[in-house]
C-alpha cells in the first residue's frame, strides 16, 4: 500500500474526523484513565452508526464547548492536509468552516414553537409575581422518586413534572427528528440526555404553568453541572429531597418495573449503566446541595407511606415554618418525642468526609464497622420513667464494661449541635410533632460505631418504644441478645419522679409531665414486651426493691445469657 492509498483509506473512512473528535474529548475531559475513556468513546461511535456520524465536539461535554480553537483554527486544516490524498478529483468533504448549528423546533401541547436559543433568553417566572416554590426530588433509578413526587404534589397542591416523562414524550412525538432519535439511543443505553436539551424542555414546561404556587420536579438534576445550569437558567430550588436506597434494592425494583411497564431504559444493560452513572454523580451532587443548605436525605428502603410521612415533616419544616405549634417547646420532653416506625435519614454534616464516604445508597458507609457492630453484645433495658433505668445502667456498664447509651440523652446532645439534623429536630419539636424514629436510630448507630474497639457491649436505655422501632433496629443493625424489662408499678414510679421534680424545683409542671409520660409509656410498652417475649429474648426484673436488690436481679439475668 502506497502513501496515497493510505490517505484515501483514512479519508474514505472518516478517520481524521474520528481522531479529531477523540483528541478534543481527551483534551477537554482529561480523564484519569485515557484508555478506558477511548474505549467508551469508540463504543459510542458504534452506537451512533459509524465514523461518519462523529463531529468534532461529539465527546466534548456541553459546558466545555466554548473553548477557542487551537492556533486560530489552523491546526485542523493542517492535520487534514497531511492525511488527505493529493488527487484533487477525490470527493472528500472539507471542514474549513464549521457547519451552522441547526435550530430545533420545540413543540408542546399548547402549540408553542420557538428555538432553543430563544427559550434560553426567556424569563421563566414573571418577576412581578411571587415565584412558585420549587422542590427537586433526586435519587437512584428505582428509588421511588416518581411515587414520592406525586404524593408531595398532591398533598401541597403543587404541579408535578417528571423530567424522564418529558423526554420520553418528546422522543415519541419527534421520532423522525434526527436529534431526538440520537437522544433516544442515548437514554436507551442508560446515559444522561444532553444537559441543555433537558433544561430547555424543563423551561418550556415551566412557562406553560405560570400560575402554580409550587412545583415538584422529579429526576433532575443528575449531576452538579445540571444543578448549576438549573440555577443559572431557572432558579435556586427551595428544597432538594434525596431518596437514598441500597444498590441491590434499586436493581430489584428496576427489574420488577421492567417486567410491569416495559420502559426502554429499564433493560439490563441500561440499568447497569444508569446505576454506574448515579453512583459516580450522586455523592458530589448531594454534597453540593448540602453546602447550600438545601437538601434533606431520606431512607427510601422502606414502605412508601413511611417515607412520605418523613418527607412531609421536612417540607412543612423547610417551606412552611410559620405554622402554629401545638405546644410550646419548653413543655416537650425530648426522650418522649419519638415517632415509632417512621424513619428519616436527615443526613449528616458531611463537610469533613470524602465524597466516596457519602451514604448515597442508604448502605452502611462504615463498611467493616457494621459487621463488628452486629457481633457485639447488645442489651435493651426497658422501663417506665422513674423505674431506675439510668441508675442501673451506670452500675451495669461499670461491672461488665458495657457502653451505656440513652436515646433521650443522645437526642438532647444532638439538639446542642449546629447540624442540619439538629435544626430539623428542633423545628419538629417546637411544632409539637413527633421526631421520626429514624433520627434516633441513626444517632444510636453513630454512637455505637464510635465506641467500637473500646467496649464489651452496648446497654441501650429507653429503646425501642414501639415494635416497629425494634424491627427496624434488627433489620439495620441486628437483634439484641437480651431485652430486660424493669417491672415497676405506676405508684412507685410516680413517687420517685415527684421526689426528683421537687429537688429540681419543677413543682406542678413536673406532676403534669409525669402523668403524661407514664400514660405514654404504658400505652406503648405492652406490645413491645409481647413482641420480645415471643422472640424469647425478654427477661422481667422486679424494680420495686432497693437499687442493690434490683442490681442483683439484673446481673443474674445478664449472666444467664452471656
From Swiss-Prot:
Q: Which residues bind ATP 2?
A: 386-391, 500, 545
Q: Quick one: where's region Adenylate kinase 2?
A: 377-559
Q: According to its UniProt record, where is this protein located?
A: Cytoplasm
GO biological process terms held by the UniProt record: ATP metabolic process
User: Binding positions for ATP 1?
Assistant: 142-147, 257
A Pfam family the protein falls into: ADK
Q: Which NCBIfam families match?
A: aden_kin_iso1
What subunit structure does UniProt give? Monomer. Interacts with YWHAZ.
Q: Which family does it belong to?
A: Belongs to the adenylate kinase family.
Q: What is this protein called?
A: Adenylate kinase isoenzyme 5
Name the source organism: Mus musculus (Mouse)
Classification of source organism: Eukaryota, Metazoa, Chordata, Craniata, Vertebrata
What is the gene name?
Answer: Ak5
